[in-house]
């Protein structure tokens, strides 16, 4: 019998983030409490999102609106790393970036967790910015998925290519 396997990845669908960004921008332009505050949200580069507003509290409220839209589109908030608000002239800016890929450090933590607490006979291999988990039994793989879902590694994990 051949080994069954799945991949553990940390990826975000850019189109879904773009949709959430446009929804948040539309809400910022139409909501009464954001009128005349200069609140806006936009892409600045491939992976960076910039929020601007006249006051720090309006900036943080705009960030909450964006996070709400991310949640509605089933995007984990761990995938968005928001920076600190910074004042530049009369406006406040906040830049945040999308977190994608599993770092080597996190991959080692995940493999150690699988080795220590997972079922016997399960192998985990680091392949670039993703992780391949394989076993002879599919039940063991499902046990590993539930083990990893119950643990917080600080990144959004997805389980793909289940074979």
From Swiss-Prot:
One GO term describing the cellular component: cytosol
UniProt protein name: Nucleotide-binding protein ROP_16630
Keywords for this protein: Nucleotide-binding
Family, as annotated: Belongs to the YajQ family.
Coiled-coil segments: none
Organism: Rhodococcus opacus (strain B4)
Function text: Nucleotide-binding protein.
Pfam families, alphabetized: DUF520 (PF04461)
GO molecular function terms attached to this record: nucleotide binding
């Amino acid at each position: 019998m051949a080994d069954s396997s799945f991949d553990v990845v940390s990826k975000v669908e850019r189109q879904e983030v773009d949709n959430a960004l446009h929804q948040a921008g539309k809400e910022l332009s139409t909501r009464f409490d954001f009128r005349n505050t200069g609140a806006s949200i936009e892409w600045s580069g491939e992976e960076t999102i910039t929020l601007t507003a006249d006051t720090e509290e309006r900036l943080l409220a705009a960030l909450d609106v964006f996070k709400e839209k991310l949640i509605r589109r089933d995007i984990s908030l761990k995938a968005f790393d928001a920076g600190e608000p910074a004042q530049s002239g009369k406006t406040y800016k906040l830049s945040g970036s999308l977190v994608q890929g599993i770092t080597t450090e996190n991959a080692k933590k995940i493999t150690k967790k699988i080795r220590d607490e997972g079922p016997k006979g399960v192998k985990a291999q680091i392949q670039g910015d993703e992780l391949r988990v394989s076993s002879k039994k599919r039940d063991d793989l499902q046990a590993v998925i539930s083990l990893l879902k119950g643990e917080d590694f600080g990144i959004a994990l997805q389980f793909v290519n289940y074979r």
